[in-house]
């Protein structure tokens, strides 16, 4: 890690996280593409939910719709619920030097749950629509409760909160 980076002085990056339920109550997850920053991560723990930064002057819900489309091609969704609180996680020290140009110590995320109302053919990840950069090389539907077990270690506690926050959302599907 860059010796000049003091994690305690870096802010959290504002972003959104997105849970997409299908008609069976399963959750969409994508497997992150391998990068140098993720070289040490076991392939079985590279699965994650769509997420991304909130642009300046952008509302979190608008960012959620935008990020979901940019990463997955999905537009056909119905909002189910917005998490009441922001969830935080810290980047591991070894990732800070190569993640977002040493500008952030981690992420603060506003989470949203949506119901997918489209056709599977709408889901396009590699390459995603409109020239967006691919983030995933595979995707699948899984049980909500399985999220923490497939996540990278530094996101597990956030995924446990996501499960707790949206567990009741299954009843509204």
Swiss-Prot record:
Query: Which EC number(s) does UniProt give?
Result: 3.6.1.-
> Would the keyword Transport turn up in this protein's UniProt record?
no
- Kindly state a single biological-process term from the GO annotations of this entry: nucleoside phosphate metabolic process
Where can the motif Nudix box be found?
52-73
What keywords does the record list, in alphabetical order?
Hydrolase
Q: Please give the function described in this protein's UniProt entry.
A: Accelerates the degradation of transcripts by removing pyrophosphate from the 5'-end of triphosphorylated RNA, leading to a more labile monophosphorylated state that can stimulate subsequent ribonuclease cleavage.
> Which NCBIfam families would you find in this protein's record?
PRK00714.1-5
Full protein name: RNA pyrophosphohydrolase
